[in-house]
Amino acid sequence: MPILGHSIPLAALGTFILWLGWFGFNARSTTAANKDIAMIFVNTNLAAAAGAVLAMFTSWTKFGKPGASMTFNGALAGLVAITSPCATVSPLSAVIIGAIAGVIVVFSVIFFDRIRVDDPVGAISVHGVNGAWGTLAAGIFNMGGTSAKIIGVQILGIVSCFVWTFVTAFIMFKLIDMTIGLRVSPEEEAEGLDFSEHGGNAYPDFGVSAYAQQ
């Protein structure tokens, strides 16, 4: 049984806080105050907007309704995807990159749910899958021109990051699982960690246990 988020308005607020912060995140990477910053601002905003719109329409087509949470993930997917190429692509390319990210995130979330990966907020799809897409897009849409060598280097970077992250994360999580334990019990998960770990329930009217007792 899925455990849904308790507040769509708070999720929307969090998305817009991240969206605003991303302007500083991407523009700061130039390490200098020059005209490139304006282009980075534009590309960042366009990619996020395109990601949100395409994720909304994709989820609408797939599920019959334009899901709010998937739309938020689409905006974040666009932001993640444009991070690598933010200073080296045109505004039109930024729209294309963000739009593709919005479509990717929907199908990626569906895929990881189908193979039973516990990712309640779609972090793998937003940051992992679309991080890889953005890295590849930096080579494909480069304003200075692209080549097989450039794309090959980008793919090598993607594979290197995946191998390093997978191996180190697997070792870390395995050690945690063998010592203090990696997951809580199904009962604690259903009841809510606010209660099981802190002795209080932040949202007593929205927990599974509140309805089970009625």
Predicted regions and their residues:
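Hydrophobic alpha-helical transmembrane bundles of multi-pass membrane proteins
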Residues: 1-214
